[in-house]
């Protein structure tokens, strides 16, 4: 029976699961997860349980199926995220003594194939970036930051927005690492950088110092007027550079995209680890943690390999993690 009225969507919970939801969220935050989106979704589940007058703690299979059912106009990604949350909560309930049904995550079919730059193409992009110049009518162009920015994207695999939101205090050139704060998964993480990349960052920092003195800018990547710039500006220069490097742009939704620096970093890193004799059983979890993913499965969309480029790596990966890259195996 559904209860009518009396329910207010907020951080307060009213169902039989209320106190346990709070414990669940706090248990995640202890490990650095902000869990803001999860908190909202848990509030919706709490309302659902309250409206359905749930009396016994423990998510039944029937309740899980009802909650996880696809909703009108709901995208595959949104539904998967919603199911992942209730799945995690059900697993938590099981761990603390309340048997619950742990639903399966809906299978997502993806035709997305990233563009993987060859090392030669990456080098051509970097060389071309060294010759970029601002237009005469736009002295405050972000162009002077682009050579360092793109090398950082390829050299670390971080996302463009993570790079553009770096503060000077987040770039540690003494110990060669950067700190990403409040990133996509709601937690801070430290990302090491190579000696050569640290030198590039140091040269850029020295070059930009004059602008920081004049405008008191805290952001690491800035324009000559001291102001930060967005991903749109970075993407504009990216399109220009791939043209200068002789790399064909195949259209919207196909690429190459700026985010493909992240995909390329992942593939090249796997290749390097394999060439150095590191077993794929160890290298995939290492890469997954480095990229800020919570599981090896999450690394799927970032490290798709093509049999043409890395057949040996693909074979090793398939043997250890079957179906991790299913769309490639079916070709």
Tell me the role of every PLM-derived stretch:
Residues 2-331:
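Conserved catalytic core of the tyrosine transesterase superfamily
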């Amino acid at each position: 029976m559904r209860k009518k009225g009396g329910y207010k969507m907020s951080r307060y919970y009213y169902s039989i699961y209320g106190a346990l939801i709070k414990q669940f969220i706090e248990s995640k935050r202890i490990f650095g997860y902000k869990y803001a989106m999860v908190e909202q979704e848990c509030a919706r589940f709490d309302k659902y349980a309250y409206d359905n007058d749930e009396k016994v703690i423990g998510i039944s299979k029937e309740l899980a199926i009802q909650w996880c059912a696809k909703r009108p106009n709901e995208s595959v990604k949104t539904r998967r995220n919603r199911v992942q949350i209730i799945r995690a909560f059900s697993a938590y309930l099981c761990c603390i003594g309340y048997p619950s049904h742990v639903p399966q995550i809906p299978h997502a079919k993806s035709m997305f194939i990233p563009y993987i730059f060859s090392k030669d193409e990456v080098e051509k992009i970097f060389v071309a970036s060294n010759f970029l110049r601002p237009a005469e009518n736009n002295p405050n162009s972000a162009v002077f930051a682009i050579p360092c920015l793109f090398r950082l994207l390829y050299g670390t695999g971080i996302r463009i927005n993570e790079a553009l939101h770096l503060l000077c205090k987040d770039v540690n050139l003494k110990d060669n690492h950067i700190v990403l704060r409040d990133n996509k998964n709601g937690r801070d993480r430290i990302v090491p950088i190579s000696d050569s990349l640290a030198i590039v960052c140091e040269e850029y920092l020295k070059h930009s110092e004059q602008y920081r003195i004049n405008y008191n800018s805290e952001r690491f990547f800035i324009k000559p007027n001291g102001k930060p710039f967005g991903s749109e500006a970075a993407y504009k220069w990216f399109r220009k550079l791939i043209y200068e490097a002789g790399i064909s742009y195949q259209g919207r939704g196909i690429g190459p995209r700026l985010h493909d620096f992240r995909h390329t970093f992942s593939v090249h890193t796997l290749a390097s680890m394999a060439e150095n004799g590191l077993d794929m059983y160890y290298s995939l979890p290492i890469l997954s943690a480095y990229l800020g993913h919570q599981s090896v499965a999450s690394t799927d969309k970032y490290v798709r390999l093509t049999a043409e480029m890395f057949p040996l790596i693909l074979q090793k990966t398939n043997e250890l993690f079957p179906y991790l890259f299913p769309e490639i195996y079916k070709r």
